[in-house]
């Protein structure tokens, strides 16, 4: 008998893309496409139950076992370092975690660098590797504003197209990490539901390589 697998999907644009991949991989759940406010959807026949959660909460659901597997951005995984298995790069939601500064800013070497970010741990790790003294300014939004109004010297943030940076006269001066969506698993679930989770992973992997092949043509 197949055991039911609980999947935490990130709400929003990325989550819809992720669900489409699960569907193409053979784990469809038609009710998820209906326009309703429900958060939990299941397909008993396929042994799968999906729920929508805030993207930054996916790792919490998976780490604590409320979900067996989930899809989380590498940025969230690096920032919170959850105790989970990372099984697969989903090859979507690709972007870069970058350092940006006002255009034409000279490099600051004679004092502590002020860095505004939503990702204090990633930022600290990055500058520790560079043995650089920094003062982290932990913001929750509109990070690009910080250097413009003199709150910080640089920012560490996610850059997709770079359009927002350009509009605010900022430029990327360094890359911290390459980010994309990852399939993660709860460690105990992986032990007790190995076959089911491996089946999902393999089906997704096949789906991803088919997609990549199609894009190459």
Regions found by a protein language model. Give the residues of each.
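Domain-level signature for soluble enzymes in the chorismate/prephenate branch of the shikimate pathway
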Residues: 1-217
């Amino acid at each position: 008998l197949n055991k039911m697998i609980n999947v935490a999907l990130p709400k929003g644009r990325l989550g819809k893309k992720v669900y489409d991949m699960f569907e193409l991989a053979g784990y469809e759940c038609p009710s998820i496409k209906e326009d309703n406010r429900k958060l939990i959807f299941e397909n008993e026949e396929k042994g799968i139950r999906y729920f929508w959660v805030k993207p930054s909460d996916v790792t919490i659901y998976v780490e604590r076992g409320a979900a067996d597997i989930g899809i989380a951005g590498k940025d969230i995984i690096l920032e919170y370092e959850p105790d989970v298995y990372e099984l697969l790069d989903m090859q979507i939601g690709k972007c870069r975690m970058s350092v940006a500064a006002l255009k034409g800013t000279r490099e600051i070497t004679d004092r502590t660098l002020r860095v505004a970010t939503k990702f204090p741990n990633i930022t600290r790790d990055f500058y520790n590797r560079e043995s650089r003294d920094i003062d982290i300014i932990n913001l929750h939004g509109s990070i690009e504003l910080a250097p413009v109004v003199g709150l910080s010297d640089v920012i560490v943030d996610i850059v997709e197209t770079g359009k927002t940076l350009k509009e605010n006269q900022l430029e990327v001066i360094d890359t911290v990490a390459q980010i994309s969506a990852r399939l993660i698993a709860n460690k105990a679930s992986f032990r007790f539901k190995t076959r089911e989770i491996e089946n999902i992973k393999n089906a997704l992997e096949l789906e991803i390589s088919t997609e990549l092949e199609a894009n190459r043509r």
